[in-house]
Amino acid sequence: MKSKVDLFVINKVREKRKELGISQRGLAAILECSPSFIGQGESDKFDIKYSVHQVFLIAQFFDCSPADFFPPINFDI
């Protein structure tokens, strides 16, 4: 089951991906994974989530900080 933190990260990545006009297939190419991994990660039906390494790769590609994808320290977990 995805934790609240996992869901926060997934939602932030999806928001940024859509903001920049990048498809799930495009993000999959960046992460060298299948497009279905991205789709399942963004779905509530699967327990797929991004690794810390993947978040760093996403941040590098989007030219932002990995911290942009994580909740604040006072986040209710």
Language model features by range: what are they?
Residues 32-49:
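Recognition helix of helix-turn-helix/homeodomain-like DNA-binding domains
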Residues 13, 27-28, 38-41, 69:
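Conserved hydrophobic/aromatic packing and binding residues within compact polymer-binding modules
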Residues 45-60:
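Short, basic-rich loop-to-helix N-cap that marks the start of a DNA-contacting helix
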Residues 18, 29, 60:
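Alpha-helical residues within the helix-turn-helix
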Residues 1-20:
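A short, Lys/Arg-rich alpha-helix, primarily the initiator
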Residues 3, 60, 68-77:
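Short, charged recognition helix plus adjacent turn
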